[in-house]
């Protein structure tokens, strides 16, 4: 049985798409090994069929500290790959892939890199000259070297199976018109039962680097929104830290808004299924999932994201009329409230955005697996 190594780490945005790819490759008869770092250890579940290996590489701004750490990690990776004898190594970008990719090059194992964002990251750009193929999610990608263009294959991103299994709901059947909200998520705590079946549901999540901001911004925006349109029937599903939930509950309760909170959503499919509109960061995996099911979003890109890639992701979607980009440095509760009200008041805008999203959807798990098989 041929062995394939996948390398991803740092955040769930890199981890979960790689797991989804691994599951597709296992179905095709390959033995899949996944090298990740300590930060992603928390995401590993017993029912995942890929074989995990933890190889941690701590970052440091001091080059004299980082190089010895990198050297040790590369030696460990060389030993690991030498014993495995893989047919190919696939890297998903970010500094956790550096050591395994160097090891693959040293052992002359073919490498493929996958860039999830609309801006080629530094690590992927470095390894582009060594890669057999470069899989990308966006046909229009920034920071791509001229020599790498011949290696490009547009595969789209890889979406988790439970998201792919979601039935795509037409936007015209959502929201304030005929959308039924009776099946409000039972898995979450702090749920207030819907008053009727015509609630407009907004799903808000920001990951570890967005939840705090959203816990302050969103309630303030909803207060303004309800002042402008008191007759709105809203349902809010929101990621929030426990410390913030009491304050937010008080605000939503006074506004007579249906709500549900969680610190972390284990099954995003459940929340997506309920939502009419998403407010989130603009990470690549989030965008791919929303694209796959045709669910429009207001994106607030993380300003500190490497190479400002989240801004480029969100701006590209806005240019394609598939989403809306509000920059964190320029946003206010009033601006966000106005945008939400505009979208709720004009269902056709949401419907058009949904259809535009579905037009750009790709079966990334299959296309990337096909590409890997071509290289082997």
Swiss-Prot record:
Which residues does the annotation say bind UDP-N-acetyl-alpha-D-glucosamine?
11-13, 117, 160, 208, 310
**UniProt KW Repeat keyword:** no
Cysteine pairings via disulfide bonds: none
Q: Please indicate if the UniProt record lists Membrane as a keyword.
A: yes
List the Gene3D superfamilies: Glycogen Phosphorylase B (3.40.50.2000)
- This protein's UniProt keywords: Cell cycle, Cell division, Cell inner membrane, Cell membrane, Cell shape, Cell wall biogenesis/degradation, Glycosyltransferase, Membrane, Peptidoglycan synthesis, Transferase
The record's catalysed reaction(s) read: di-trans,octa-cis-undecaprenyl diphospho-N-acetyl-alpha-D-muramoyl-L-alanyl-D-glutamyl-meso-2,6-diaminopimeloyl-D-alanyl-D-alanine + UDP-N-acetyl-alpha-D-glucosamine = di-trans,octa-cis-undecaprenyl diphospho-[N-acetyl-alpha-D-glucosaminyl-(1->4)]-N-acetyl-alpha-D-muramoyl-L-alanyl-D-glutamyl-meso-2,6-diaminopimeloyl-D-alanyl-D-alanine + UDP + H(+)
Q: Could you tell me the EC number(s) of this protein?
A: 2.4.1.227
**Compartments, as annotated in UniProt:** Cell inner membrane
Domain of life, per the record?
A: Bacteria
Please name the GO terms of the biological process aspect recorded for this protein, alphabetically: carbohydrate metabolic process; cell division; cell wall organization; lipid glycosylation; peptidoglycan biosynthetic process; regulation of cell shape
* This protein's GO CC annotations: plasma membrane
**Molecular-function GO terms, alphabetical:** UDP-N-acetyl-D-glucosamine:N-acetylmuramoyl-L-alanyl-D-glutamyl-meso-2,6-diaminopimelyl-D-alanyl-D-alanine-diphosphoundecaprenol 4-beta-N-acetylglucosaminlytransferase activity; undecaprenyldiphospho-muramoylpentapeptide beta-N-acetylglucosaminyltransferase activity
Which pathway features in its UniProt record?
Answer: Cell wall biogenesis; peptidoglycan biosynthesis
Q: How does it sit in the membrane?
A: Peripheral membrane protein
- Pfam families to which the protein is assigned, alphabetical: Glyco_tran_28_C (PF04101), Glyco_transf_28 (PF03033)
The family database entries (PANTHER family) matched by this protein are listed as: GLYCOSYLTRANSFERASE (PTHR21015:SF22), UDP-N-ACETYLGLUCOSAMINE--N-ACETYLMURAMYL-(PENTAPEPTIDE) PYROPHOSPHORYL-UNDECAPRENOL N-ACETYLGLUCOSAMINE TRANSFERASE 1 (PTHR21015)
Mind telling me which HAMAP family this protein's record contains? MurG
Q: Which family does the record claim for this protein?
A: Belongs to the glycosyltransferase 28 family. MurG subfamily.
The job of this chain, per UniProt, is described as: Cell wall formation. Catalyzes the transfer of a GlcNAc subunit on undecaprenyl-pyrophosphoryl-MurNAc-pentapeptide (lipid intermediate I) to form undecaprenyl-pyrophosphoryl-MurNAc-(pentapeptide)GlcNAc (lipid intermediate II).
Kindly give the NCBIfam families that the UniProt entry links to this protein: murG, RPE4
Instruction: Identify this protein by name.
Output: UDP-N-acetylglucosamine--N-acetylmuramyl-(pentapeptide) pyrophosphoryl-undecaprenol N-acetylglucosamine transferase
Organism of provenance: Rickettsia conorii (strain ATCC VR-613 / Malish 7)
Gene giving rise to this polypeptide? murG
